[in-house]
Amino acid sequence: MFGFIHESIRQLVIRNYGEDTWTQVLERSGFESGKENIMNHYYSDTDTYVLVDSVSLVLKVTKDQVWEMYGGFLITYSMEIGWDELVRSMSPNLKGFLDNLDSLHYFIDHVVYKANLRGPSFRCEETPDGTLLLHYFTGRPGLYHIVKGVVKEVAKRVFDLDITLVVQGRTQRSVHMNNGERVEEHVVFLINNLSEPRRDSEGSEVSLLTSTNANFPTIVDDTLGISLDDFSKALPYHFVIDESCKLVQCGSELHNHIPNELLQPGTPILRIFEINRPQIPLDFENICNFINAVFVLQVKTSPLKKKHMDAMSQEELKQEMETLDEDATNELTQGHHLKLKGQMMLLASKKHIIYLCSPYVTSINELMQYGMRLTAMPLHDATRDLILLNQQRLSDVEVNLQLEANNEQLETMTRELELERQKTDSILKDMLPRRIAQQLLSGEHIEACEHEATVMFCDLPAFQQAIPQCSPKDIVNMLNEIFRKLDRIVVIRGVYKVETVSDSYMAVSGIPDYTPEHAENMCHVALGMMWEARSVIDPVSKTPFLLRIGIHSGTITAGVVGTVHPKYCLFGETVTLASQMESLGMAGKIQCSKWAYQKAMETGRFEFSPRGRIDVKQRGLTETYFLTRSLKKSIWEIIDHDRDINVNSIEGYEELETAIENAVTIKSALPRPDQRNSAACSIS
């Protein structure tokens, strides 16, 4: 169904029940907000039924009640958005309004929106007692409750009538159409007026329900006559049929679109035309039943193309076919079948019907497709004006469609941009401390400042020896495996990873948020890293990789450097000393400076072994210590893993020390790198 239906349902729910209720309807129906009511979009019937089912469930009313409520609101909403004058000008009474619903429906579908939708048909009958019988035909069974709502609201708002609408009968039948078989529902309503009779200024009763047939004198000049040729030129597209639906006469212009052999008296009309609307079998009785409907007939043949092809030689025809694409070839061989739109009128004899019509052409493009020009239509034919006016309307509709498409594209781009922004923010928060990243995203200026913190460097002493033994891909995989494990420990212990360069890893504790336990935290991180490195195998020694870690505590300067690629950098002697603690350390050992040792022991409890004095650049001989274990936390607490009571010791340090000692022993017994054969890199 057309998007206007969905939009009016949305308006109905929001106005009467609020935005929250409509949100519930969308959630239940599975529609994305903003995609459920695109005005010029055609939704499948299934989509519309799902939407109405959701409204019914959310409002706790039956679907029939929803449809009837919608029918009444449809009139209210349509009159609010600009259709008020048209609705009120259709007829002075309800019968005339209902008899013209077909033409109004056709105009909205085919002219205003150019949708070519499958709409219902209506026909009224007056009864002797002054009531109305409304016949409603539709290819969508079960929607007749909409009609009840529409008719009641029109009677009340337009004609100020209080009516009752009772279903007198409801039948369904299978109808064979050109596009296949479909089920058609026929519902008969009895309409009764409950309002007081109205009278005009002369005191005569005026019926707003049924039509009033006044008998006016007819002026006839018996000497006046019109020849068949004149009549055929005045109405160039008309035809007359008899009770057998056989052709009696036709207009002159039809010969330009239909072969002459078919336009002979006695030719069954079904050989010439197929009916598009109303969707009924094309016979005399059905035409009389739908005498008030708009009839759209389509020519079954296309003689213009046929004449063009017949006039060509076989060689010319073959050459033209070869130069055309598939669509153009189809157009040449099949042609455009002319459509006629007009009114069927039962003549006084009751034995003949005349079809008063015009070509159903609404744009210059269609006019050209039929090989026609404006001169093919009489000056009195309003179709000429319609084509010119509709040409401008089509331009406006095209602009509106483009605007809707642009708006939808803009919304999509906005959502995609938001996703990309979130990704960028996430990357920035990975590159910088979270608080610093948040300040940058908020547009705040980050001032460099001094902090008391603990810096750690670690590397893989055996890494350079492993490079010749591995492919580049294996080297990258090995580093990723190690750094992924180290990153996990850093995150668990609340320490900030500054950077990695080749096999070197740098982290800091106490920045940018100060904590008095910065040295204690960094010592725990170092122990956890030593443990995690055990699971990555050195391809040379076939033993676990041994880390070399150096830690130093002191004052450092930290700040954000760069704008395009911002980086959180650390400066000062503390960074230099921490780097030397690592470079002057030993594989499998965590070397701490005297200041890191003192800071760690202030808040934590650790076991250190003195290394003695080492010569540190710019500091001379400096006291250092090897960290062996924490007396406050077990390995399992540090790495946040459960202990296997059947395998592991309570603290875990025995396994760590044993693994390190074994790896050191094996590595020390290996020959120098230039004496070894190459080996493959393995990661466990």
UniProtKB/Swiss-Prot annotation:
Residues 454-582 form the Guanylate cyclase domain. It holds the Pfam family Guanylate_cyc. CDD domains: CHD. One of its GO terms (cellular component) is guanylate cyclase complex, soluble. Disulfide bonds: none annotated. The keyword Coiled coil applies. Belongs to the adenylyl cyclase class-4/guanylyl cyclase family. Heterodimer; with other soluble guanylate cyclases. This is Soluble guanylate cyclase gcy-32.
